[in-house]
Regions:
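Assembly/oligomerization scaffold segments
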Residues: 1-106, 238, 295
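An acidic/polar, Gly/Ser/Thr-rich interaction patch typically located in mid-to-C-terminal regions
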Residues: 37-61, 65, 193-295
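Extracytoplasmic/secreted envelope proteins and their assembly/folding machinery
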Residues: 87, 131-135, 166-170, 236-238, ...
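Short beta-strand-centered interaction patches in the first periplasmic/extracellular domains
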Residues: 97, 101-113, 140-220
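Short solvent-exposed strand/turn elements
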Residues: 101-117, 280-295
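Second-shell loop/turn segments in exported
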Residues: 118-127, 155-159
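Glycine-rich, acidic and aromatic/proline-enriched surface loops and short helix-turn segments
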Residues: 130-144
Length: 295
């Protein structure tokens, strides 16, 4: 992987329509529009989010962003190697002056319309597998759905449900010892502590690892029956790592970590991506991830 020459593309518009794209270098100025972004993604049921500041957008581009349910696809990386960091719906937009420039602040939410607007009313007679229930719910949400290799679901008898699709997912996945999240508009359902695929991305100094991994701990409680006081003990659960921008690594992926402090295969539980196309220093175009031990 060559971590050279930062590149990004921001593509915006309503689904199925022509919108706009920025990020390519202007042939006259030799520069692209400046972008600053912070993307937070994880394996929880909460929607992934991003805040994006982009400078000197045209009035036509601003009009596209102002449309209801405008979709943004943010791609970033290096010369010849970009990947989607996040795809989501604009939830807030505001443009202000910043000296001689204009700065447009954009908030986006992954899967906003699907989770906000979809209610389901279902009733299945007899025995129905949980996978069928949530697959039908995903179709109602307009989302594709993926399952990790070891996902299994129990059968539900005479299952009925009325309410939000997200509550249905929570109920069925909770009863199946699986977890769901939305990643770039796709629902991912994973068995406990399992990645969505078996493929692992190598993360080492040669592929962009910055510095050394930092231990992550869970606080676990232990108590003595003869004493009401509760003590805390630290149990290691994984590693926190920083690395140069790599949009190929997403939440629910496996990472093969290669470092003198830690090595092995881990699952990405959370990943924060920060970028400034005109920033200086390697820390202005990076990812920070929490990698959990795979049991």
């Amino acid at each position: 992987m060559r971590n050279f020459k930062r590149e990004y593309r921001l593509i915006a518009g309503l689904t199925g329509t022509m919108g706009f794209e920025v990020g390519a270098v202007d042939a006259t100025t030799g520069r692209s529009l400046r972008i600053v972004f912070n993307v937070e993604r994880g394996d929880s049921e909460s929607n992934n989010t991003a805040s994006i500041n982009i400078y000197n957008l045209s009035p036509q581009s601003l009009a596209v962003l102002a449309q209801d349910n405008c979709v943004i696809d943010l791609q970033a990386g290096y010369d010849g190697d970009m990947a989607t960091i996040i795809q989501g719906i604009v939830s807030h937009i505001e443009t202000n002056r910043d000296g001689a420039d204009t700065c447009t602040e954009i908030d986006i939410v992954d899967g906003l319309v699907a989770t906000r607007d979809t209610n389901v009313s279902v009733s299945y007679k007899g025995s129905i597998n949980g996978k069928k229930i949530i697959s039908d719910a995903a179709a109602n949400m307009g989302c594709s759905i993926l399952f990790s290799p070891s996902c299994t679901f129990p059968a539900f008898k005479n299952f009925s449900f009325v309410g939000s699709a997200t509550k249905l997912f929570h109920q069925v996945c909770g009863a199946s010892n699986t977890n769901y999240s939305i990643q770039n508009g796709v629902i991912q359902v994973c068995a406990a502590n399992e990645a969505i695929t078996a493929m692992a991305y190598v993360l080492s100094a040669e592929t962009g690892l910055i510095g050394f991994p930092e231990r992550l701990y869970d606080n676990a409680s232990s108590s003595n029956s003869g004493n009401a006081n509760t003590t805390k003990r630290k149990t290691q659960k994984g590693w926190k790592v920083s690395f140069l921008m790599n949009g190929h690594i997403q939440a629910n992926d496996y990472v093969a970590l290669e470092s003198s402090l830690a090595s092995g295969t881990f699952r990405v539980s959370k990943i924060d991506t920060k970028g400034d196309s005109e920033g200086t220093g390697e820390d202005s175009w990076t990812c920070t991830a929490e990698l959990l031990e795979v049991s």
